[in-house]
Amino acid sequence: GLIASAQAYPGEPMRDPRTMDQVARACAAGGAAGIRAQGLADLALITQHVDVPVIGLWKDGHDGVFITPTLTHAIAVAATGCQIVALDATGRPRPDGLTFAQTVAGLKEARPDVLVMADCGCLDDARAAQDAGADVLGTTLAGYTGERPVTEGPDIELVDQVAAIAEVPLVVEGRVHTPAQAALAMEHGAFAVVVGTAITHPTTITSWFVQALRSR
């Protein structure tokens, strides 16, 4: 099914927990099977107001590991009431010195009721994340960590590779901008597809139309 990602970037007009809560509720009303959101304030509201599973994360910084980068971040995200916590699952150094596997183990010890989504950048990440006990594998970081090219749409080659080894649900995320691309990801083995920008980021959507008109 469809997971709608409701996130706004720092400095943007929609960067407000109440706004993101409304966006998440609107997506759920439209049939989204789940919501992905970031930030403790946003998550605290969204988890109260939607009846679908929420994937929570905490973006801290802009370089290296910044998606729920430490065990402390992960436990705080879990405390907001979300059912799934998303973590950077790459092998890059984490700010607290723990490995991804140690972070998963620590989170599951603290919150055995919460599932872990591994945000992967390549097949090796997915393999290691699955071995570490991740409950969901995501292609979130494909094209952003150096191992994979930045594809025009979702990285279908990586989807095929991960689907072939996955023993847990595979969630395709990253550059899914059309319903056709989402459907293609499902055909290639996705359990669910995350769509963010194309649904919940009007600044970017507007820019697509503006660029198309200017090019004529």
Question: Where does each model-flagged region fall?
Answer:
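Short beta-strand/loop segments at the ligand-binding rim of alpha/beta enzyme cores
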Residues: G1-A4, V50-D63, T103, K108-G121, ...
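Catalytic domains of carbohydrate-active enzymes, especially glycoside hydrolases
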Residues: V23-R36, T80
